[in-house]
Amino acid sequence: MKVHCKTLQRIIEITTLHNDFKRLSENKCKFNKLFYYIELYYNQFMLNTIIIQPPLVQLNTPYPSGAYLSSFFKTVYKDYKIQGTVKWLDLSTELFHEIFCRNGLSLIFEKSKKKALKLADNLESQGDDNSAFQLRRYVSQSKNWCNWIDSIVAIVCGSHNLSGREFTHEFVRSAHAPRGARMENYLSKLTRDVGVDDSQILASLALADLADYITAAYDENFALIRYAERLATSEVSFSETMKGLDSPVLTDFYKPLLLRKISDLQGQNLFCISVPFPGTFTAALQSAGEIKALYGENCTVAFGGGYINTELRNVSEQRLFEFCDFLSYDKGYGSYLKLLEEYSKSETGIKKLLDGSQIYNVKYCLDGKIIQPLERDEELENAERQFVKNLIPDFSDIDFSRSPRLADDANPMHRIWNDGAWLKTYMAYGCYWHRCAFCDTSLDYVKNFCSVNQKSYFEGIYNQAQNKGVYGIHFVDEACPPVGLQQFALQNLTASKTMPKLTFWGNVRFEKTFSRDLADLLSYGGLTAVSAGIEIATGNGLDSVNKGIDMENIVSACCAFKEAGILVHSYMIYGFWNQTEQDLINSMETLRQLFAAGLLDSAFWHKFTLTLHSTVYQEWLDGKHQDLQPVPAPKTQFAENDIHWKGENKSQKYADGLNSALELWMHGEKLKKPVESYFQFRMPKPSIPQDFVDKLIEKYEKKRDSAFCEKPAAEKKYVWIGGKPVLLKSSGGIQLCWSYMGELLYADVQKEKSCEIIKLLEKIEAENFDSENVSFTGKELNSVLGEKLFKSLRGKGLCALI
């Protein structure tokens, strides 16, 4: 590379020295022709990397893989002195704006109105008058929808050209504003007059209503979050998946968008297409096909991401490699590092490196033969771990003002998912538990746990927040390590002395480490919500799925979080292969009690799916779980992950009852209704006590209070989060006064030590934490505060660290 760059530099020098500039200026044709050839010569040694997120993923914030890959490639380009640009294109958000605008809706209504009216006639003849009415109303209101759509979008996301705030008053009240079924359902349930505060929810529901119309009358594969998801599951052949390439949304909207974004690239181009979910795979194929048609031999296309890692682990479908040149498994860093290292030495195209040799975590096809990946490479594995520890996701290519903040539910935990432009990131790759029976524990993204370098990570992610003006962090870890969360909160508090504080939330495990002390500190340090798996809320159920925690741990963690003002969401499983009906109803009853006690804000029921990479299936292969009976499936060359098993459909009948009850509980309704009454068939009564959760809460409170009454541990570290204490005179002497969680609290102190106490508490504020400073130790605190005052402050601003 260096030789070619020097050669180019020499050509330019010779041109400058041996030509008279004035003469060249007079003959522009020769001048331009010379530099045209110089540019051609230079371009053949450039390598551009374009990271593409095809639609559709969560709209309010970009999927994080692009941020990590962007940072990775920029680092490697610098290290290997590779010439070219690195660009990340979030085409999911861009497609949203292509569709939901005046021109987009006009095109959709024009192409779909005949089909919509015909469909309405058919539905009416079948007795579905409501659906027929809705379709006819969309067609009738099409001009109104087109007139309003830009204002509706402006309400849910920032816009450089249009402020949505002023339209909220008219939108929520006008009899002439467009309405759909979801909007009207929301309005009908209001027990008050509609106001401008409802505008964001109504605008979000308006988009959902339009999405319903698009799915019904224009493109059956369309959904606001996933596109053509059913076309890429383990149940579908590659031929059937390819049929989705002719879908209207892809041909009318996505193809023109893609070509606009990529049509002006020069030199060699590496396209890294992220496929996190089945619902992005069809658009990934469309992207690859258009790229190949446009750039031919000047491009190399790679697929990677969650869907590739799970569903296409064993793929042997050669037609797939007509779209992509190779599949990159797992993190991707090692495989790309190897390819770029070889590229920097040889300066041949990336594609020429796919010569039949095995490459770490890369699968490709050469001359009709699938070349399997090299599964182990110690040097590259170590390099990957270093990237995991040190990479800072790079969001510089993202315009967060274009991200819609959708708010289609009043539930606060549901709102946090969609209502905010979060920087999605992780503080640890993989899961530190990685033993759950249902989880893909044999895959890299679960089993290979590795934490980030906490100090440099916080500094880097804070820099990203400042650059983009987005101070919300969503940790997408499999489960955030408690120690990592504590350290992040302390770093956040230190930064907050001079700069805005980050607000953050993420996935955790409901374990005993999350004490009231830790929850208080995390809440004070910016944690606003957690999500975690309970799965099966019974002792037997937790043991069956090998969760590694019990109901006492779960209730304890939930109590601590809720007392600290942190939102809590839980994932639930039904239909586990050996779950009994009694165990299911007991789990449902425990969930009801958790909601009734105010320990959960939201939850979600998942139907158990047996997967190829799960612990329970691997154990079955080893001769365990003989009652589990996987159904032999025909060999497939395409997607392979979900495994059918005898009896799997028996649990489907429970879905409606579980979900209808949960929907009520999440909105504080019907919390005393017997759980068995939600089903249209006979169910056993729960066999757990009605006060099961209440008893566990009592146990938590006793342990919490006992911990607050313990003597200070000499080497343990403590921090103060009780604000600025003041001294007051009282009839008995001197009192320490401070505010904590909205309460004004008092404690008697010795007059001669009062100033020293104030100084110590200010010194050990969490914002000042220094792990090397002895002032934060129990020994130092005890010497200044004394045991009595120490205990008076515990749980009221004085937090013990883990």
Language model: regions and residue ranges:
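Glycine-rich beta-alpha loop elements in corrinoid/cobalamin-binding modules
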Residues: 56-59, 64-65, 69-105, 116-119, ...
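Flexible glycine/acidic-rich beta-alpha junction loops that bind and position SAM and/or redox cofactors
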Residues: 88-99, 308-317, 540-545, 574-582, ...
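Structural recognition of alpha->loop->beta junctions
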Residues: 317-338, 521-529, 586-610
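Canonical Radical SAM [4Fe-4S] cluster-binding loop centered on the CxxxCxxC motif
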Residues: 417-455
